[in-house]
Amino acid sequence: MPGPLVCDIASTELTDHEVARIRSPLLGMVILFTRNYKNPAQLKKLCDSIHAVKPDVLIGVDHEGGRVQRFREGFTEIPSMHTYGELWKADPEAAARSLTAAGYVMASELRACGVDFTFAPVLDLDWGKCEVIGERAFSLDPRVVTRLARALSQGML
């Protein structure tokens, strides 16, 4: 059973030091960033090498769409979650359908490369006061956030 710690890696290939760290019984997850990505084939090779070291370690990425999409070349560009919140105002059903489709695409592309999960959806409310959240949030309305997060999650299953 993997442990509670999360680590990152420095580049697009594992070093001997990183292999040793991944083998630690305390490590449960490796998080990837843009610096770990060149293209889908390289990402698949990296994820395969991580899982070869420790098959039960999780590989995650902050890949939400919009400006927080760590892998771009070879991946479908997913709009920001705020875009779907705006669509909700005009057509809630279309927003939910679009998000379910986006979730499917996002998860399918990540899984094809060996990534186990993404830190999406963001459930923060958009109070309009935090640039870090901004377009990452669906809406200020918690009911809208709940419905849209559910739609995205259903697509990711």
What function would you assign to each model-found segment?
Residues L26-L148:
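Enzymes and membrane/adaptor proteins characterized by extended Gly/Ser/Thr/Asp/Glu-rich
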Residues M1-T15:
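Boundary/entry segment of secreted carbohydrate-active catalytic domains
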Residues L148-L157:
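Phosphate/pyrophosphate-binding betaalpha-module
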Residues G3, D16-V19, T118-P121:
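N-proximal short alpha-helices
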Residues L14-I31:
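N-terminal glycine-rich anion-binding loops that anchor highly charged ligand groups
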